[in-house]
């Protein structure tokens, strides 16, 4: 028999290991709605309200808080408790003045890193690809599923793996951070997840093999990671606070 649409359920034991939730306390978990991030690199908004921040004891209480519009993601009110909040997203609570950025820690778990109100208006976006669209415009497609249009004359300022510092929620480009030697990067996946440092070398391989970058951390230690795991967050120093 053919499938009747996407899966709607998720057992806790099968939930991504990046989530900080109790796996044996209950049978079912909240399955994030299809959206800006994939399931492995995001977490449902309900868990942020209840399990991460402790503003609710039950899912019902968490949904009530969200329905009152008390939580913002990237400067916009989000009421959907299944909304996927992923890497580099900013979670804000205007009533308490709290602001957090979603980042992975050294064991690959998604955490809420406290940030200032000023930094909450800045979101780094990694360019996945770009393409031409109607009206002689170039569409930049970012890691969080969003996109942005730029004039054709500016196409040579933006390339794959570059990072755009976007002002949210206005969606205004503040700065472009190139992926090059000397750039400051944060590793988002792999065995070196959450490590940070400056790019020393970019190794390119033929025949479809993924590119590798060599990074020097703050202690002077060198390590390698895949290019797609390295997220540029600054030129000679990070433009955002990191854990």
Swiss-Prot record:
GO terms for cellular component: cytosolic small ribosomal subunit. The keyword Ligase does not apply. GO terms for molecular function: rRNA binding; structural constituent of ribosome. Pfam families: Ribosomal_S4e, RS4NT, S4. The keyword RNA-binding applies. Belongs to the eukaryotic ribosomal protein eS4 family. HAMAP family: Ribosomal_eS4 (MF_00485). This is Small ribosomal subunit protein eS4. It comes from Pyrococcus abyssi (strain GE5 / Orsay). The gene is rps4e.
